[in-house]
Regions:
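N-terminal glycine-rich anion-binding loop in soluble enzyme alpha/beta folds
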Residues: 3-74
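Mixed-charge interfacial surface used for oligomerization/domain docking
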Residues: 3, 9-17, 22-23, 28-36, ...
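Short loop/turn motifs at secondary-structure junctions
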Residues: 1, 85-88, 263
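Short beta-strand->loop
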Residues: 93-95, 125-128
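Intrinsically disordered, glycine-rich low-complexity segments
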Residues: 297-302, 311
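Hydrophobic alpha-helical signal peptides and transmembrane signal-/tail-anchor segments
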Residues: 306-314
């Protein structure tokens, strides 16, 4: 027996967490000084979308949002309870190169295993990603568990997936990246005036990398579709993910265009998680899929790659 755990940045809708028996540890944000739990286990998809609209509207209106790590104490209490119940643990983290959450979990896991002598295991998987790039790994692991694979078989197999699970996204307004200090306010202002839309992706090392640029919202959405369709492998056996920061109509458009070109097993369409979403801002939209690697080709349609940058979320 083993438990699959994610943090709420994995962006798995509540109903799917129940279906796949995935435990979620929630981030807690401060919004204008008031605590907000990022994941609520009993929300319907409609309620999740409504909560997302409320949250991203608050950001549009200038709310002060502060994010933080899940403490090693919370990890330790959670891990200890499961290990003492004689179960192994498989935990999927945000990329450790954009968050310190992996290290918090590592400290907790070491402390629990030092105290426990029942032979149970804790394995941590660095997703090298965020949002559904993290969540899809947990879902695939759950499917393997359901098929009867052992803990080590699942962990050994799923550890090969992050190198092929691509995350590609765009932002709605450059000012939110400027607020992180990784883009000047002047550059953001000019970029917005010219309707320059960047495309970013997760690198093979789990950093956020600026990849391409487009002119206009529809063009950048089409380019996300191109990149997915040109690089996905075995789509008929894949679940693809679409996450949006209160850009529901755009997410439906992207899914419609993808389905016109390829057949996929399933699509998860969800509101972008509130922790990482606060750093990229409203109208951000991401797609997630398995490719042969994370060195994306295709797409482009003449748009040259840009130099890379990376930033820590927390």
């Amino acid at each position: 027996m083993f438990e699959i755990i994610v943090d709420s940045a994995a962006n798995i809708p509540a109903e799917l967490c129940k279906k796949y028996k995935i435990k979620v540890l929630s981030f807690v944000n401060l919004v204008n000084g008031k605590e907000m739990t990022c994941f609520e286990p009993d929300l319907t998809p409609e309620q999740e979308r409504a909560k997302g609209k409320e949250y991203y509207d608050a950001i549009r209106e200038g709310a002060e949002v502060k994010t933080g790590l899940i403490s090693s104490g919370i990890f330790e209490d959670t891990f200890r309870e499961i290990i003492e119940a004689d179960k192994d643990i498989l935990y999927f983290s945000l990329s450790k190169n954009i968050s310190g959450n992996y290290n918090s979990a590592r400290v907790a896991a070491d402390a629990v295993l030092d105290d426990c002598s029942n032979g149970r295991k804790i394995r941590l998987v660095d997703s090298l990603n965020a949002s559904l790039g993290q969540g899809l790994l947990a879902i695939y692991a759950s499917e393997m568990r359901e098929k009867g694979m052992s803990f080590d078989e699942v962990a050994d197999t799923i550890e090969t997936y992050p190198a092929r699970l691509n995350g590609v996204f765009t932002v709605g307004n450059l000012k939110y990246i400027a607020r992180t200090g990784r883009l000047s306010g002047t550059t953001a202002l000019v970029g917005n005036m010219l309707s320059i839309k960047p495309i970013l992706r997760g690198s093979k090392d789990g950093y956020i990398v600026q990849f391409r640029k487009c002119r206009g919202r529809k063009a950048v959405l089409n380019e996300l579709v191109n990149l997915l369709c040109d690089n996905i492998t075995d789509p008929e056996n894949q679940i693809i993910g679409v996450a949006h920061a209160d850009a529901y109509e755009d997410s439906l458009y992207v899914i419609e265009q993808i389905k016109k070109r390829i057949k996929v097993r399933d699509v998860i369409n969800t509101t972008y998680d509130f922790c990482t979403g606060s750093h990229v801002g409203p109208e951000s939209l991401a797609v997630f899929f398995m490719g042969k690697d994370r060195e994306l080709g295709g797409g482009g349609r003449g748009a040259p790659p840009l130099s890379f940058f990376f930033f820590f979320l927390f």
